[in-house]
Amino acid sequence: MQLSKNPIKQTRNREKNYTDDFTMKRSVIMAPESPVFFPPPLVFSPTSVKTPLSSPRSSPPKLTMVACPPRKPKETKTTGSDSETVLKRKRPPMLDLTAAPTVASWCSTTRETAEKGAEVVEAEEDGYYSVYCKRGRRGPMEDRYFAAVDRNDDGGYKNAFFGVFDGHGGSKAAEFAAMNLGNNIEAAMASARSGEDGCSMESAIREGYIKTDEDFLKEGSRGGACCVTALISKGELAVSNAGDCRAVMSRGGTAEALTSDHNPSQANELKRIEALGGYVDCCNGVWRIQGTLAVSRGIGDRYLKEWVIAEPETRTLRIKPEFEFLILASDGLWDKVTNQEAVDVVRPYCVGVENPMTLSACKKLAELSVKRGSLDDISLIIIQLQNFLP
């Protein structure tokens, strides 16, 4: 009688083959969705504004923009098992926003670095601001940011524009907003200065948000983005948002929220949505428009555009000596850290010290959010308002 092969040995062989296959599959690293992790660095001439990533279908701005080769970023890796690629940027070229009436961004990574999947991006301009972005655990990085400062030392006012853009359903809307919103706002302000209309700073910001949204919808792309921006001009600070990105200011050590989160559960937002024929319901403890989206304002979201508006809320303040610093951040931070906690963490690094370390403060805030269980992308900018006093 012929004996059959050992069934235990066969089972073990099958288990080994399955384990090998599974190991190979899970070793694939997910690359970022977009080849551009952040917008490329730009240099503006006094005669133009044209963004390289804008679609031919978008309305071209009046001025001309010349793109320069990005500087090679410095990459470092942390020691230990959880290594991460860090992109660092310091000292951008001087920007003259008076000579060139547009807002220019130098914040970027190269395509090569983005394709390698940078986990962390750091940028700073000593004495003015620091940026820190950390990719979450849910997938590709969908946040973008924008920062530009006119560092004129002729005794005149310093001008600046900052923005944090939190994408959902992909990074295209956040990337588009980062590249175009500042230019659109500046175009509206330039129009007002030329006497074409009498729009104020707030109305120029509103016009910039609406135009950015309209232009993105013409692109035919999916997804959307929440936005929070800070425009500083002639000693005035205008903070705006659409969505749940938030701006918090330290006024003598006390946290003051300068924006309100636009969620469907808010009474005024719920009333507006229902008046337009939409509905809001609760899914797993989160209120969502039409059962899908958890924010009620932002750029994009074409399939919910009837209810998700790009209309920003803006608050304008004259910068005063008691205004210490401003934090702009995505909800990856604010979902886990309260406004006052954020101010308490940052203040020892920025106030009453000879050499402020705002980048270290950014890292501490992000680490606190991650420690408390945040899985989302975290992007934040800390702006030292004392250096923009009129």
Swiss-Prot record:
Tree of life domain: Eukaryota
Domain PPM-type phosphatase: 128-385
GO molecular function: metal ion binding; protein serine/threonine phosphatase activity
Enzyme Commission number(s) from the entry: 3.1.3.16
Record field: compositional bias (Polar residues): 1-10
InterPro entries, sorted: PP2C, PP2C_BS, PPM-type-like_dom_sf, PPM-type_phosphatase-like_dom
Catalytic activity of the protein: O-phospho-L-seryl-[protein] + H2O = L-seryl-[protein] + phosphate; O-phospho-L-threonyl-[protein] + H2O = L-threonyl-[protein] + phosphate
Biased composition range(s): Low complexity: 44-61
Cofactor note: Binds 2 magnesium or manganese ions per subunit.
Binding residue positions for Mn(2+) 1: 166-167
Cystine pairs: none
GO BP field: abscisic acid-activated signaling pathway; stomatal lineage progression
Disordered: region residues: 1-20, 40-85
Cofactor(s) of this protein: Mg(2+); Mn(2+)
Key words of the record: Hydrolase, Magnesium, Manganese, Metal-binding, Protein phosphatase
Gene Ontology CC annotation, any one: nucleus
SUPFAM superfamilies the UniProt entry points to: PP2C-like (SSF81606)
Chain positions recorded as Mn(2+) 2 binding sites: 166, 331, 376
Entry's family note: Belongs to the PP2C family.
Name the UniProt record assigns to this protein: Probable protein phosphatase 2C 30
